[in-house]
């Protein structure tokens, strides 16, 4: 058995390294940081990378010419520290971890490195955590362990009641200790969970060859201590004068106080002082002058404040304006400058003038910005960038080491850019763009994030994005976060009709894609966008309450509520504004014709929508101990909004409602009342210089795939065969004996989907037509302003509908 939140995967690790050198156009698209890099580079990927790069790497850092990293052995029992010299292309082990197991596999001794730092003479400092099972515990006989002992131990470990401990054992733990014949190994559980540990934390300094220079015990603990405090190390750092800084956090176990400080040691391991800090510090940064500064957030920005090691104090004045990217580290770049990571790029920041200069955008050199975890300057002036991320397609971590050499602009090959704008870059999209770039010589997908750091709300950010991107004629493609953005752009004629490409594609046809998703992406008969996946939003209720056929009207919903005792709620937590927006999304195309810039709000249908919204409170005030799942089970809440992207939700809701479900949908005059939610919505702009190349990039998201791991992506496939395969896989036996899912007081054991469940979901999905998020914020604001007069009782619903009709028509005419 396993929990929903835990997905067990056998993870292996590998490094995909392209061989040889390549040149990529540099210049970067416009963004919130609109500066264009004035530096140009060639990029190469070393051939002879160490075998350890194929394992699980941890805590990778570039210091000078070396990559220092931790890597596990083949059976993942020992983690050691290695050094790879980039210039010489040599590898060596600096420190070997230890681990000892009993015959049954129980670990009784382990050592690992929490943090490391490198000095100017290439000495390496390690913060080592050594833990051992106590001698008394090793000699303890567990053979007589009983079920009651196990439950008591669970209660002790997690402070649970007896009933909760029994539930924990039955649902999450027992399967691991139960043999096929039903025999339960209680003794093995007690060995695993009843062990008492003693630990030692120590500082270890080794030279560049791995020889120990000194070893110093920092603290020791044992299970018999009645300690009032817990102490953790948060990182170690070196300055340019041989001093070592150890960040510590000490907090009381009763939660009443915290203490943050930095212990300082000289090059021989002698303690030289302690620096008290005001609060949590994100990390330490070595400055170009060799001093160390603390990095922390002050308000909205990251601030650097230098440490004075002579007085053991921190400067009150700091360098401001960083965006938090210094948590990825920094490297000295000349006498006064730091190399820092900002918004998908590398920049240099002058510590005296505070001026910045962008050196490069990662995407310009096919380096995945979202996966960069270390960078540095080599002794010959080249820039090294190490990246690593989990690949959903390869089901393992993939690592890369890129070496960038500065060249003259005249040496750059001529490359046509396809500029893609988005609010936030998805790592999977980034990976696909990089793969596309490597295969298409002469063209380069360049993705720029447009997110306004000064925006106070999501709506503000949407407006900022829409304004900036709509005005930028250099943008070829847009990745929309919100369907209302698509409506806004398409209504202004800014999007290209994708049907002209789809209908001429030799491998992809309209019949390959979900027909209702295509319809949802149409405006005036033109395919203005395509999502990479979709989900369904609808309403569920007990079949005994709402019947068995999806779809109903406002009057039928009101009648259901009227038939129930006073105080019964239709939905838990829904407000008037939310209810009204749902109605508008459902009937958007009947209310607004974007192609002709006309609207139809002075209708009985919209009046009914206003009356429906008025059934809900202006603000929802729930009780502190209220559980919506219990209220639904007891019939005090009749309906629930249902977000469908897999089949487990069905079984959970059936358990909560304790009845057969009907996907009744939101009240509407047509359709099944379900809405399609589009994810990662792509469009090609009218200004696109190379629309055929843009389509070549876009189409790869919709080609057939044999990848069994597609099910790990959010939502349903836009391809019909992908959706059908998803349904087919949902009926297969579950791995690991299945899993359970809990909601409030309810817990259900998830089983393979039944034929009945599959049929119901297919009917729901294929017949959903409305699109969630169709209403723009500007339109919603006009409606809310006028609807308030009806909700307050000042005007009738009909009068408000007429006023909305008048204002909306003016707005549509002005913004056409």
Residue positions per predicted region:
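Glycine-centered hinge/linker elements that transmit conformational signals in sensory
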Residues: 595-627, 651-653, 661-666
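C-terminal motif of bacterial Sec signal peptides marking the signal peptidase cleavage site
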Residues: 22-25
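Beta-propeller blade signature
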Residues: 83-85, 198-210, 262-265
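Short, solvent-exposed loop/beta-turn-alpha elements that line the ligand-binding surface or hinge
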Residues: 499-512, 589-609, 665-675, 793
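Long, aromatic- and glycine/proline-rich binding clefts that accommodate carbohydrate-like moieties
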Residues: 712-789
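Conserved N-terminal structural module of periplasmic/extracytoplasmic solute-binding proteins
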Residues: 28-84, 89, 115-119, 128-133, ...
């Amino acid at each position: 058995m396993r929990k929903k939140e835990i997905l067990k995967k056998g993870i292996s690790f590998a490094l995909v390294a392209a061989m040889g050198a390549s040149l990529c156009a540099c210049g970067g698209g416009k963004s919130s940081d609109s500066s264009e890099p004035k530096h140009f580079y060639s990029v190469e990927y070393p051939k002879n990378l160490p075998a350890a790069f194929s394992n699980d790497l941890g805590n990778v850092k570039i210091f000078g010419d070396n990559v220092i990293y931790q890597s596990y052995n083949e059976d993942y029992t020992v983690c050691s520290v290695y050094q790879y010299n980039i210039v010489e292309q040599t590898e060596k082990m600096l420190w070997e971890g230890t681990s000892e197991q009993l015959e049954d596999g129980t670990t009784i001794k382990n050592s690992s490195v929490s943090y490391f730092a490198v000095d100017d003479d290439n000495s390496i400092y390690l913060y080592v955590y050594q833990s051992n099972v106590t001698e008394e515990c090793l000699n303890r006989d567990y053979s007589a362990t009983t079920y009651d002992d196990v439950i008591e131990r669970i209660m002790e470990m997690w402070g649970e009641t007896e009933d909760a401990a029994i539930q924990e054992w039955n649902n999450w733990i027992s399967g691991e200790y139960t043999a096929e014949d039903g025999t339960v190994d209680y003794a093995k559980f007690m060995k695993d969970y009843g062990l008492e540990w003693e630990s030692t934390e120590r500082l270890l300094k080794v030279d560049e060859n791995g020889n120990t220079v000194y070893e110093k015990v920092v603290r020791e603990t044992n299970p018999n201590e009645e300690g009032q405090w817990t102490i953790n190390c948060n990182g170690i750092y070196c300055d340019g004068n041989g001093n070592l800084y150890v960040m510590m956090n000490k907090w009381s176990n009763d939660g009443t106080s915290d203490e943050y400080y930095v212990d300082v040691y000289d090059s021989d391991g002698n303690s030289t002082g302690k620096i008290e800090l005001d609060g949590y510090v994100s990390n330490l940064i070595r400055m170009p002058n060799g001093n160390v500064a603390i990095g922390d957030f002050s308000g909205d920005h990251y601030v650097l404040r230098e440490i004075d090691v002579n007085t053991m104090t921190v400067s009150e004045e700091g360098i401001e304006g960083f965006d938090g990217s210094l948590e990825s580290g920094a490297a000295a770049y000349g006498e006064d400058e730091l190399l820092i990571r900002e918004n998908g790029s590398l920049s240099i920041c002058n510590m005296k003038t505070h001026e910045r200069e962008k050196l490069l955008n990662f995407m310009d050199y096919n380096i995945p910005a979202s996966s960069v975890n270390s960078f540095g300057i080599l002794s010959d002036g080249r820039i090294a960038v190490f990246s690593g991320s989990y690949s959903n397609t390869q089901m393992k971590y993939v690592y890369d080491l890129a070496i960038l050499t500065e060249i003259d602009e005249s040496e750059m090959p001529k490359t046509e850019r396809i500029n893609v704008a988005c609010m936030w870059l998805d790592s999977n999209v980034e990976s696909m763009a990089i793969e596309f770039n490597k295969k298409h010589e002469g063209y380069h997908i360049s993705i720029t994030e447009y997110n306004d750091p000064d925006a106070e709300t999501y709506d503000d950010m949407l407006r900022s994005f829409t304004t900036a991107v709509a005005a930028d004629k250099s943008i070829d493609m847009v990745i929309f976060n919100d369907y209302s953005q698509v409506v806004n752009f398409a209504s202004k004629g800014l999007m290209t009709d994708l049907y002209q490409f789809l209908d001429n594609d030799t491998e992809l046809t309209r019949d390959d894609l979900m027909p209702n998703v295509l319809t949802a992406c149409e405006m005036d008969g033109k395919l203005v966008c395509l999502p990479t996946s979709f989900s369904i939003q609808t309403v569920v209720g007990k079949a005994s309450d709402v019947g068995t056929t999806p779809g109903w009207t406002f009057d039928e919903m009101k009648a259901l509520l009227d038939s129930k005792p006073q105080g019964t709620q239709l939905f838990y937590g829904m407000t008037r504004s939310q209810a009204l927006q749902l109605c508008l999304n459902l009937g958007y195309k009947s209310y607004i014709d974007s192609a002709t810039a006309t609207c139809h709000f002075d209708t009985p249908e919209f009046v009914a929508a206003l009356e429906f919204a008025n059934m809900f409170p202006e603000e929802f005030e729930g009780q502190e101990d209220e559980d919506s799942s219990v209220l639904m089970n007891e019939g005090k809440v009749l309906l629930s909004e249902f977000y469908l992207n897999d089949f487990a939700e069905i079984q959970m809701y059936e358990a909560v409602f304790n009845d057969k479900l009907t996907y009744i949908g939101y009240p509407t005059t047509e359709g099944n009342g379900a809405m399609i939610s589009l994810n990662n919505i792509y469009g090609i702009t009218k200004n696109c210089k190379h629309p055929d190349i843009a389509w070549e990039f876009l189409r790869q998201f919709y080609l057939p795939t044999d990848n069994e791991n597609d099910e790990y992506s959010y939502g349903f496939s836009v391809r019909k065969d992908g959706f059908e395969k998803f349904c087919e896989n949902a009926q297969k036996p579950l791995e690991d004996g299945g899993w359970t899912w809990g909601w409030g007081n309810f817990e259900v054991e998830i089983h393979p989907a039944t034929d009945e469940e599959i049929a119901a979901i297919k009917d729901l999905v294929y017949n959903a037509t409305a699109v969630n998020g169709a209403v723009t914020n500007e339109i919603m604001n006009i409606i809310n302003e006028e609807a308030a007069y009806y909700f307050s009782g000042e005007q009738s619903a009909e009068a408000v509908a007429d006023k909305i009709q008048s204002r909306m028509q003016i707005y549509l005419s002005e913004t056409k």
